[in-house]
Amino acid sequence: MAFTEQEIHKLNQQFKGIPPEEIISWAIQYAENPLVTTNFRPYEVAILHAVTDVAPKIPVVWCDTGYNTPNTYKHAEELIARLHLNVKLYVPKQTSSHRDAVMGIPGIDDPRHQLFTEQVKLEPFRRAMEEHKPDVWFTNLRQGQTALRDSLDILSLSRDGVLKVSPFYHFNDSQLDAYLKDRNLPNEHKYFDPTKVLENRECGLHT
């Protein structure tokens, strides 16, 4: 399933305003090895519900940094059980307790922050992608989250040529709230990403 940038641009124009479920069904139809990634942050339930409603057995890759809030872990367990998620868990090679003893969580201005991000997020993510080798990657990127994400669209290509599909790209928080309410889906806002710290920073997965 290979598309040129020109084809992707044309498809993005066609998909604007199309329900997420239809975009997902289109992508699943052409995908040979799709997956969806999640960190169970706020509104992740939308992409997980929508994708697994179309493809119930799709691999759900969760790269757990080890630094999630108790609320996030409880939320994750609730969604895994409720949506019957086929979770593939990836964790850092070093435990958070070990890292806390020798490094802690460096601030974003600390030179060690890049190494910290590599250890807890980027390396586990690369390992997951190398093992699954997806051709379609469902994610919940949305316009307005960061400057980089504002430059993307519903469909985009990763640096490795994987087709990223963000069916809720044009949804704002109010629209997602309505989506969740209509489907009686839970949300959780007590979330912290130590690799980003600030809401408008990128962690490196989508750069």
Language model region names:
Residues 1-207:
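Nucleotide-activated chemistry modules centered on ATP-dependent adenylation/adenylyltransferase
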